[in-house]
Amino acid sequence: YRTMFEALEDVLRAKGNRLAELRDTLLGTMKAGFRELYPVRFPWLNSTQETAVNKVLCARDVAIVHGPPGTGKTTTLVEAIYETLHREPQVLVCAQSNMAVDWISEKLVDRGVNVLRIGNPTRVNDKMLSFTYERRFENHPLYPELWSIRKELRQLGGRARRGSYDEREGIRSRMSRLRDRATALEVQINTELFDNAHVIASTLVSSNHRLLNGRRFGTLFIDEAAQALEAACWIAIRKADRVVLAGDHCQLPPTIKCYEAARGGLERTLMEKVAANKPSAVSLLKVQYRMHEDIMRFSSNWFYDGELEAAPEIRHRGILDWDTPVTWIDTSDMDFKEEFVGETFGRINKEEAHLLLKELEAYILRIGGSRILEERIDFGLISPYKAQVQYLRGKIKGSATLRPYRSLITVNTVDGFQGQERDVIFISLVRANEEGQIGFLNDLRRMNVAITRARMKLVILGEAATLGHHAFYKQLLEYVKKVNGRQ
C-alpha cells in the first residue's frame, strides 16, 4: 500500500512532465491524441478486433480495448503488443494479479516474443518459471563465473578472519578485485537480459521493482484493467509515455475488503473513469465466440447497448435438438427459504441446491452418459454465495449418480468463474425471502459474469417473487420467458 500512496503522491505533484500530461488526459480535460496512420490489415481478426489494434497503434496517450465476454480480448491484446513491438524495441505489460500476468505472458511466448518476467518466482506458474528474471540470470553464460567468484569470496572471508596481518592485507586486496569483477558481471548480465527482452512483464505493484528503477517504456499495456486498483495502475504508468488498458468494466471489479473504502470510490477503476472521460479512446469488441446467441443477447442488451453479436459458427450451437438455450426455474411456489450462515460464507438455500442437482442429473440423463464422457461435455455450477457452493460440492461428492462425471463438473462462486466457460451452466441465486432483499446480487457486474459463462445451455434457479423486485432480474425473467425457457 505504501507503494500505491507514493505513486498517487507523484501523480498529484506532477507538473510539466509526461506523468502530468497523462494525468490530465486520462482524468482531466486534455484531449487524447491519435496519429494519422494507414490502417494495418489483420485478416485473422474480425473487424472490431482489427479496429482496436489500429487504435492502439495510433494512440499518443491512451487506448482502451473493451472486451465483453467471449470477444477475444486476449487475442486482440496479444496482437496489439506484437504489432507495437514492430515499432518499439520494448514494452511493459502488467496486470493486477500474477495469474493474469502469467496468462498474457504465456500467449506472448507462444507468439515467439522474448518475455522477461519480473516478480517473486514462487508466485509464477510452472510454464513461466523459465522466463523469470531469476531463472534467466542463473542460465546466463556468464553466471558460472559469477557463482565461482562468489564462492571464492566466501572462502576468502573465512581465511581473512584467521590469517596474519600480511595475509589479511593480501586477501582483502584479492577480495576487492573479485568484488569489482562480480559487480561488472552482474551489470553485464542484467544489461543483456533487459536489452534483449521484448516484453517486461510484472504485476502492477512489482513494476516498482528495483530492477526497473530508471527504466522507461514507450507503451504500457495493462491487462484485466477493470479488476485493477487505480492506485496500482499509476505505479506502472509513471514509467510509460502512453498506456493501453484492456478489460471489461461491466464484469467483476477489484476485490475491496473494506466496505467504507469501496463506498469511498476505491472500487471505481481507472479504466472505468477513462472510458467515461475519453470515449474516443475506447474500442468495443463486438463479436463473441462463446455463447449461443440467446444466451448472449440479454447481457448484450443490458450491459453493452445491444452491440454484441454471436459469431456465425456458434450462433446456434447446442447440445440437444429442440432444447432451449436459456431456462429459468422459478422456485416461488416451492416454499424454499434462504439461511444466513455468517459473514464469511453468506447464505445457503438447501432446497434450491437439491433441486439444482436433480435438474443436473435429469439433463445428464437426457444427453446420455456415454456421450458426455466421449465428447467431454463439461458443466459449471455457480452461486454467488460460498455456503451454497460448499453445500453443492459436498452433495456432488456423495452422489453415486454423478460420480462418473465429477471431473467434468466445476462448482464455484461467480468470482471463481471469472474468465472461464463451460458447455452447460447452472446458477443458484439462493435468495428467497418475503422482504425482497437480494444483498450483493445488486452488483449486476457479478451477474453479468454468471450469465455469460455458458456456451450452449444456461439454467437459472431462483425465486422470482424475491428477485423480481429488481429491474434487472425482472427483465431477465421476461427475456427468458420470451425465448421459451421459463418453467
Map each language-model feature to its residues:
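Pre-ATPase regulatory/linker segments immediately N-terminal to the P-loop/RecA-like helicase/translocase core
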Residues: 1-54, 110, 127-155
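Conserved beta-strand position immediately N-terminal to the Walker
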Residues: 63-67, 91-92, 379
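Conserved helicase motor core of SF1/SF2 NTP-dependent helicases
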Residues: 87-89, 97, 191, 205-487
